[in-house]
A protein has these predicted regions:
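Short beta-strand elements
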Residues: 43-55, 163-194, 316-319, 406-414
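N-terminal alpha-helical targeting/anchoring segments
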Residues: 29-84
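Structured beta-strand/loop patches that form or line metal/cofactor-binding pockets in enzymes
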Residues: 17-49, 138-162, 380-406
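Acidic low-complexity segments
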Residues: 6-10, 16-29, 74-165, 199-241, ...
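A glycine-rich phosphate-binding loop feature that marks nucleotide/adenosyl-phosphate handling sites
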Residues: 22-34, 96-101, 144-151, 229-243, ...
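Internal alpha/beta scaffold segment
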Residues: 62, 67-92, 166-259, 324-325, ...
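Short acidic, glycine/serine/threonine-rich loops at helix termini
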Residues: 31-36, 149-167, 183-191, 245-252, ...
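Dual-mode signal for accessory low-complexity, basic/Gly-rich regions
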Residues: 105, 266-484
Length: 484
């Protein structure tokens, strides 16, 4: 994989301050069964190269799917031309930044390779789909299976070489029930494929996908006759498949350093977080410990090196409630330091494909487990709601004021779980919400989750992220139902 690219690339490198080649090849297969009928399979092979050139302070890049010598030569020339055009006109002197010079390999650990034929995969999905139709009020249901194999090569003019291979699996299942003019849906892991992980067939067993159809359908039917979630100030216990969204929107996006520096302000927005907050800001209660951890082998966004070549390592983003680090990669950290801000970042510069430039992204952003069991958290609540599975979200362009909804809730009264409620929602402000964190679940309440659909950037990039979290209890939260 490396020999032909490396030799050709190094022959063509111009006399510049920095030049890199990043090759990406993805092979994916998406299979789906809807209402027991297989849908057309979608298979794709996508490959190409991104060239980056830094010279005399300018920064340029160019991508091509033509990986021949002439294609590489043309891409290098275009990237060099953009570097010349941006020299002295950019937000920073890029030649002043020291880029990583990595060397290494990484491969997703796979315990059980997926050896099933396409027919066998469809049969598995049809069996799970058939289990969903437990009542005539079930009007729509589907099961799907998405696998991706990715190969990457990163080479620089100064001798860096990194090879990485990843295997991703995304199982999904959803059910919709309808009666008396109302529809309610339940999904396995959420609408955005929360049980996605790296690995092989072991993910299916680990996620609990087999046998999930009947339970998911039963819960959709229960929601049809459930009362609306009550409104008012009360305690909330969020399970991991909602914590995933809470972490993503009100910790992950606000802490992306390029957003803090203003790069996204006219598109995806800014952040309520400012550079002077790092090291002192009380982001959450002392129970809040958030880590960036691309080293967790089976989590969705694990890797050994980011797309600028920075080595992956676990780091605390928030420790005992105090904001410590930003989600910023090599270049953004250097830009912040050039402005006089001595912030620390992580190895999180990533792109979604060969035809996009790397930018600051979430990777695996996790809440560390605490000491409380789920039973202890429930027992501590006088009045509240336990909520599962994200359904909807709305958050302002500084990632501060938010309103989130879940698929299903369960009342808690006097320390006991009560009946199911539908349309549970809550609202808050990121800058203060995490200070209401009152209990953090132990490892028995933790789920390792993620999503393939985190969007950001111009042109748009949709990337994989991971979120592992225990169940968490928050006090005095503004809760409301669909009529609230």
């Amino acid at each position: 994989m490396t020999a032909s690219f490396e030799s050709t690339f190094k022959r063509l490198i111009p006399a510049v301050d920095f030049c890199s080649l990043r090759f990406v090849e993805e092979t994916s297969e998406q299979l789906s069964v809807r209402q027991n009928i297989p849908e057309p399979p979608h298979t794709c092979i996508d490959r190409g190269v991104m060239i980056t050139v830094i010279d005399k302070g300018g920064y340029g890049y160019a991508a091509t799917s033509d990986i021949s010598e002439s294609g590489l030569r043309a891409a290098i020339a275009r990237a060099h031309e953009w570097a010349k055009l941006t020299a002295g006109r950019g937000v920073a002197d890029y030649s002043a930044f020291a880029m990583p010079t990595p060397s290494g390999r990484y491969r997703t650990p796979v315990q059980q390779p997926i050896l099933l034929s396409m027919r066998e995969k469809f049969e598995m999905l049809k069996a799970e789909s058939a289990d969903c139709k437990i009542d005539d009020r079930i009007i729509d249901w589907s099961a799907s299976f998405w696998t991706t194999h990715t190969r990457q090569l990163y080479v620089t003019a100064d001798g860096a070489t990194v090879e990485q291979e990843f295997d991703y699996l995304v199982p999904s299942l959803s059910v919709t029930a309808f009666a008396n003019g109302e529809a309610q849906s339940r999904s396995f892991g959420g609408r955005y494929n929360g049980f996605c992980q790296q690995g092989g067939a072991e993910i299916i067993a680990r996620s609990g996908f087999h046998g999930a159809g009947k339970q998911t359908a039963a819960e959709a039917l229960t929601l049809l006759t459930a009362p609306n979630c009550p409104s008012g100030k009360m305690d909330v216990i969020l399970m991991p498949d909602q914590m995933m969204l809470q972490i993503h929107e009100s910790i992950g996006h606000p802490l992306e350093l390029d957003r803090i520096l203003g790069d996204e302000r006219h598109f995806a927005g800014t952040s309520f977080v400012t550079l002077d907050m790092f090291g002192s800001y009380q982001y959450g209660s002392p129970l809040l410990n958030v880590t960036f951890d691309p080293t967790m082998a089976h989590q969705f966004a694990s890797f050994a090196f980011d797309d600028d070549g920075a080595a992956a390592k676990k780091a605390f983003i928030i420790e005992n409630g105090i904001l410590k680090r930003t989600l910023g990669g090599t270049i953004s950290q250097a830009r912040a330091r050039a402005q006089g801000a001595m912030v620390e970042g992580v190895s999180t510069t990533r792109s979604c494909s060969w035809n996009r430039a790397p930018i600051d992204r979430m990777s695996n952003l996790n809440i560390e487990p605490g000491t409380s069991s789920l039973e202890e958290m429930i027992g501590s609540v006088e009045k509240g709601v336990l909520m599962r599975t994200n359904l909807s979200w709305s958050i302002d362009d500084s990632r501060n004021k938010f309103q989130f909804g879940c698929e299903i809730g369960q009342l808690i009264e006097n320390g006991k779980l009560g009946h199911i409620v539908k349309n549970p929602n809550y609202r808050g402000i990121s800058a203060t919400f995490w200070r209401s964190l009152a209990m953090v679940g132990n490892v028995s309440t933790q789920e390792v989750m993620g999503t393939p659909f985190c969007g950001k950037g111009e042109p748009s990039q949709v990337i994989r992220v991971g979120h592992a979290s225990p169940a968490c209890k928050f006090s005095d939260i503004d809760v409301f139902g669909a009529e609230g």
